[in-house]
Curated annotation (Swiss-Prot):
Domain of life, per lineage: Eukaryota
SUPFAM superfamilies: F1F0 ATP synthase subunit C
Organism of derivation: Nicotiana tabacum (Common tobacco)
Keywords: Hydrogen ion transport, Ion transport, Membrane, Transmembrane, Transmembrane helix, Transport, Vacuole
Lineage: Eukaryota, Viridiplantae, Streptophyta, Embryophyta, Tracheophyta
Record topological domains on the Lumenal side: 1-10, 77-95, 156-165
Protein's name according to its UniProt entry: V-type proton ATPase 16 kDa proteolipid subunit
């Protein structure tokens, strides 16, 4: 049976791989950051239980990383429309690079947030003046994931520009 698809047959594979990469790698970063900083919060909570709610900030910041991957995965998956029957390799590669940019940036940010959050909440229990410094470092680590999200959106918007319309 002849195919009615006018693009490259393998192109949607790369597009969906980009969506999966964005979500999987971002969630891996979020999971690592949440687990690593959560261990620090639990250890600190034994000594200073009154600081637990204040020290939950790294856990929340790590959890947000998964949302960035979800956003890019949804953008990519809505860009893969089989009804148009024209999804080319350029589009698939653009979506793949978009997903990898967002996902790997989220993974690296999650690792940074986890390590800084773990050490930061433990140090905050002993010296409360370190809280502001910890928050600033966490913000810069979160910015890494935001850079990936922005680049992912830009790359994803490039898909579809290969068609002569």
């Amino acid at each position: 049976m002849p195919s009615t698809f006018s693009g490259d047959e393998t192109a949607p594979f790369f597009g969906f791989l980009g969506a999966a990469a964005a979500l999987v790698f971002s969630c891996m970063g979020a999971a690592y950051g949440t687990a690593k900083s959560g261990v620090g919060v639990a250890s600190m909570g034994v000594m200073r239980p009154e600081l637990v709610m204040k020290s939950i900030v790294p856990v929340v910041m790590a959890g947000v990383l998964g949302i960035y991957g979800l956003i890019i995965a949804v953008i990519i998956s809505t860009g893969i429309n089989p009804k148009t029957k024209s999804y080319y390799l350029f589009d698939g590669y653009a979506h793949l690079s978009s997903g990898l940019a967002c996902g790997l940036a989220g993974l690296s940010a999650g690792m940074a947030i986890g390590i800084v959050g773990d050490a930061g909440v433990r140090a905050n229990a002993q010296q409360p003046k370190l809280f502001v410094g910890m928050i600033l470092i966490l913000i810069f680590a979160e910015a890494l994931a935001l850079y990936g999200l922005i680049v992912g959106i830009i790359l994803s918007s490039r898909a579809g520009q290969s068609r002569a319309e």
